[in-house]
Each structure stands twice: as structure tokens, then as C-alpha cells.
From Swiss-Prot:
This is Adenylate kinase isoenzyme 6. Keywords: ATP-binding, Cytoplasm, Kinase, Nucleotide-binding, Nucleus, Ribosome biogenesis, rRNA processing, Transferase. It comes from Mus musculus (Mouse). Residues 108-118 are annotated as: LID. It comes from the Eukaryota.
Amino acid sequence: MKLPNILLTGTPGVGKTTLGKELASRSGLKYVNVGDLAREGQLYDGYDEEYGCPILDEDRVVDELEHQMQEGGVIVDYHGCDFFPERWFHIVFVLRTDNGVLYKRLETRGYNEKKLQDNIQCEIFQVLYEEAIASYKEEIVHQLPSNEPEQLEDNINQISKWIEQWVKDHNP
């Protein structure tokens, strides 16, 4: 049976991981958090002193994911999307969060002030939505609100319906 590949993207703190894990457990699709994948495989290309975090080796991440993406049925969670091959994804969801809510979430994570401000700016200017629109066909890119628990449930239901329909349409 053919299964779709889904990309969940958005600024850090918008709820990609919470949504992705819950969606995977309900749909049976495989969940891949690119940050965890990079950590486990040491898929890094240096260290960013300013942000206090490792720099992702994008080519190695793509190589690492290629086989499972070809098989299908994968939910990928990452705060960027411009380096993934366009052919990988059947749909892209950009999660959006109000600045006040996002600020509190990132503060709770212990982000330094520069990292906090840059991520809030990223959300204000819709940087990741613009990146998604530039990287994929516009008709497969959708924005979802992610401010409160009720919206999480709505998003799971909406994406689950989409998965069911995609499976029906692609498995005669």
C-alpha cells in the first residue's frame, strides 16, 4: 500500500514535535524528528557559537532519509525545509503560533535572548511559510494555527482526514 510523506515545519516552539508524534501514533505513519536524527547520527558540519548549537550537515541528512522517504509513510519534523528534495513530500504543513505564546514556549526552553528574538522575528515575518512556498508547489503548502490544545486536536483531525483521502486516491 502506498502511503504519503508529510512535512511539518515552522519556527522552533510552534508544536511540530507534539503534533508529529501524536499524528504518527494515530495514523501508523513513521515519525522522524530531523534534530533527533542528526543528534543520533552526528550529522553535523560544525558548531554555531552565536546560537550555541551544532550546524546541520544537510547533505548527510538527505542521504540518511532517502530510503525511507522513497518507501513512503513518513512524517518529517524540522524547522526548515529548503534542502529537502521537492519529490519527497505530498503535503507540507507550516505551523503558526502567536508571538506571545511562542515567546513563552521558547523562554521555557531556556533560549538565550538573541535566539529568542531571532525566532520571534522569523515567525513575525513568516520566514518558514515563505521558504515552504518557494520550495514546494503552492497547492501542497498549508498553514495551521498552533496556539492552544484545542487547535492541536483540530490539526490532527484535519491531517488524519487528508491521509485517509490520499490513501484512498492512491491505492486502487
